[in-house]
Amino acid sequence: MIALILFPLILLTVLVSLLYWKQDQVVKELLQTLNDDFAGHFEIKESHISPFENFPYISIDIEDMVLYENESKEGVHILDVHDTYIGFNIWDILYGDMEIKSILLNDGSINLVQHKDGSFNITDALATKVEIEDPTKEFHLNLKSINLADIDINKLNESNGMYFDLFINEAKSNFKTVADDVQMFLDSKFIVTYIDNGDTTFIHDKHLDVHTEIDYIAKKDILKIVPSEIALEGSVFNMEGNIDFADDMFLDINFKGEKPNFDLLIAFAPEEIAPTLKAYNNRGNVFFNGSILGKSINGHTPNIDAVFGCTEAFIENTSNDKKL
């Protein structure tokens, strides 16, 4: 009985010791490979073993990972993450196989900039200096999951001042490979803000929950979003569509929503007036149809269309019993 209890503890100790012994070599090789292969410049502060943070994987915690657009390190960083956990399978470690199975980014920021010529700072940074025949072998990757926690992603378009801010409270994704195609299952909670050339829009501090499956079709270089659910400020929408990477990231995404009250409209209302709208009793057949269609990179901006409708509606002011 005592042996059965002690065996898992002894095994875990052995595995952590093996990873501790190899961590410096793993991190050094990874950092050198990244800087040798890509135009951008990566830096880290230090690393240590974290057995349980990314369980069931045993992880190396890379502290304060930073990515700059180029080796001169001019301008704002692209990536600055306090903790980057790279996870390894327990049994793989025993056999000396150090493939990275999981990545967890915790507490940081990603700053994306679309330059006036249409290029992105991140694509410039990840432009390869040498030909990479197989990225999975080059970086010892066999990813099964990528997770984010408390990551602030923002995107600025220098030509028109459009600015998006996406604060990810939590995002969990799992991968399954079928031939050359990849299925990804995503659950996430985040807050989104959109600023148009310095002016705040109605999309400000909106809370979204996304539950979706995304399929990447390798031969066509297309990302397919299967029918999924999005919750915006508590109102549920359906979403589906495609992203064609080969055609300047052509977006063809559709949204639909229906409610027996005005919750759909309130979900899109500016933050300062939403509490006032919620104070009224309301009812009606409210629907929303939205779409994003068109190329989205290299100087292109997709068309965004939204249509609201309502039938058999009424609004009641509970303070004076007046109805509209």
Mark where each language-model region is:
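Outer-membrane beta-barrel proteins
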Residues: 90-94, 292-297
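Secondary-structure transition motifs
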Residues: 40, 57-59, 63-181, 197, ...
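Transmembrane beta-strand segments that form the barrel wall of outer-membrane beta-barrel proteins
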Residues: 151, 221-229
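Beta-propeller and related beta-repeat scaffolds in trafficking/envelope systems
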Residues: 76-79, 181-183, 187-221, 266-285, ...
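N-terminal type II signal-anchor transmembrane helix
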Residues: 1-39
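Short beta-strand segments that buttress and anchor functional surface loops
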Residues: 64-67, 226-232
